[in-house]
Amino acid sequence: MAASVEDEFEDAPDVEPLEPTLKNIIEQKSLKWIFVGGKGGVGKTTCSCSLAVQLAAVRESVLIISTDPAHNISDAFDQKFSKVPTKVKGYDNLFAMEIDPSLGVAELPDEFFEEDNMLSMGKKMMQEAMSAFPGIDEAMSYAEVMRLVKGMNFSVVVFDTAPTGHTLRLLNFPTIVERGLGRLMQIKNQISPFISQMCNMLGLGDMNADQLASKLEETLPVIRSVSEQFKDPEQTTFICVCIAEFLSLYETERLIQELAKCRIDTHNIIVNQLVFPDNERPCKMCEARHKIQSKYLDQMEDLYEDFHIVKLPLLPHEVRGADKVNTFSKQLLEPYSPPKK
């Protein structure tokens, strides 16, 4: 006699929840690109800097890039960073840089462009050409950053991303650039006189649309390579950071669905700023907050049972400076336990 559905469920083994840490990320040596993102104000920067610190302990060289115009990694490490990789104080193999992709190619340092006469004007001409295609200027700035980063051969790159909308544009930049360059190729003959005129006005000599197209096409192999790597779970993953509130949970679910559409791997969620009750010093506000957070935590554990869900506490102090980031980072590897009273 066939077993009933109820019997099958009774016989099925309980599914053990995945370890609530980021050890799986630290131990996956094949990872090249790690994105950390989520809604604004949830502690993405603290988490991404902490992850970079832990990676620096086991990887040869680590770069953390902020693509958030707020540039909070300078605040987190209490050290000023710029558009080029700079060594984090106290570390030999951890570097940081900050870019503002919304400024497009104008944001890139001159070091990104070659020195010879034809290409030294690349920055000015790319700004002029890209302005005709909405979105591609930002995408090209990502592309140039990727070209630089790949040339430096960092073991792993951590992205401290801007809030969700910017992040999705970052992940889609290869498609945007290829589409934009395709349109540029189609109209290059029409804009050739404009390009020549601009070069003469800038005192850069003769340059035609074919030369500009050639300059831009040099970036395409890097873009295609990065695009393939982004879609390879062995090389790329995305860590979602949120807090245990409705809007943050909603944004996280939307982000995970968009990542799936982009074929970007994600299997880790950090739930930050959790309040734990203090029996010795009861606080009605804290208890109410804990109750609300517990409700959303339960929902997350049901919804994301195939994710590593890391729980981090709300702290009574700021995490600022390399030492505090280092201390905080240890909680990514060991499940947090509230102090026993």
From Swiss-Prot:
Primary site of residence: cytoplasm
Keywords of this entry: ATP-binding, Cytoplasm, Endoplasmic reticulum, Hydrolase, Metal-binding, Nucleotide-binding, Nucleus, Phosphoprotein, Transport, Zinc
Disruption phenotype: GET3-deficient embryos have impaired swim bladder inflation and reduced body size. From day 5 post-fertilization, the mutants display abnormal cardiac contractions and decreased blood flow velocity in the dorsal aorta and cardinal vein. Mutant hearts also have irregular shape and thin walls.
Keyword Transport listed: yes
EC class name: hydrolase
Keyword Repeat part of the UniProt annotation: no
Catalytic site positions: D68
UniProt-listed Enzyme Commission number(s): 3.6.4.-
Residues binding ATP: K39, G40, G43, K44, T45, T46, E245, N272, P313, L315
Binding site for Zn(2+): C283, C286
GO terms assigned for molecular function: ATP binding; ATP hydrolysis activity; metal ion binding
Superkingdom of the organism of origin: Eukaryota
Localization in the cell: Cytoplasm; Endoplasmic reticulum; Nucleus, Nucleolus
InterPro entries associated with the record: Anion-transp_ATPase-like_dom, ATPase_ArsA/GET3, ATPase_ArsA/GET3_euk, P-loop_NTPase
Phosphoserine modifications at: S4
GO cellular component, as recorded: GET complex; nucleolus
One of the GO BP terms on file: post-translational protein targeting to endoplasmic reticulum membrane
Catalytic activities: ATP + H2O = ADP + phosphate + H(+)
Record-linked SUPFAM superfamilies: P-loop containing nucleoside triphosphate hydrolases
Pfam (any one): ArsA_ATPase
Assembly mode: Homodimer. Component of the Golgi to ER traffic (GET) complex, which is composed of GET1/WRB, CAMLG/GET2 and GET3/TRC40. Within the complex, CAMLG and GET1 form a heterotetramer which is stabilized by phosphatidylinositol binding and which binds to the GET3 homodimer. Interacts with GET4.
Family, as annotated: Belongs to the arsA ATPase family.
Main function: ATPase required for the post-translational delivery of tail-anchored (TA) proteins to the endoplasmic reticulum. Recognizes and selectively binds the transmembrane domain of TA proteins in the cytosol. This complex then targets to the endoplasmic reticulum by membrane-bound receptors GET1/WRB and CAMLG/GET2, where the tail-anchored protein is released for insertion. This process is regulated by ATP binding and hydrolysis. ATP binding drives the homodimer towards the closed dimer state, facilitating recognition of newly synthesized TA membrane proteins.
Name of this chain's protein: ATPase GET3
Organism: Danio rerio (Zebrafish)
Lineage: Eukaryota, Metazoa, Chordata, Craniata, Vertebrata
